[in-house]
């Protein structure tokens, strides 16, 4: 597990995965990291590529941040919260948000990554790069004639 080696590397990998997911799905995505035990932390919201990354402030848990944010925007926008915490699910649903379990969200992200790979492989197969595609027309005709044995180069 990457988290056992470096928590920062694990966070960055998660942010990259969710950034790809967001780009494919097209939703606004907010990733919340718990930083409530970090002394003097003022909290921070960063833009990482196409997602928002929140580090909670000292004495504020990720759950508290999610509850507050869901309360502010949950009735105006379609908000989905990924959590397996049963109490948190009840609270955010009471604020008008949808909920998805962490396991279900993980599986959705995995399916999305698979779709992205399949699309990339299909497009890569359709866009083969051949030298003749980039040659001038007269050079391409000459090389084709050589290939077919119509012209012998000495």
Across the structure, where does each feature detected by a protein language model lie?
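Nuclease catalytic cores that cleave nucleic-acid phosphodiester bonds
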Residues: 1-154
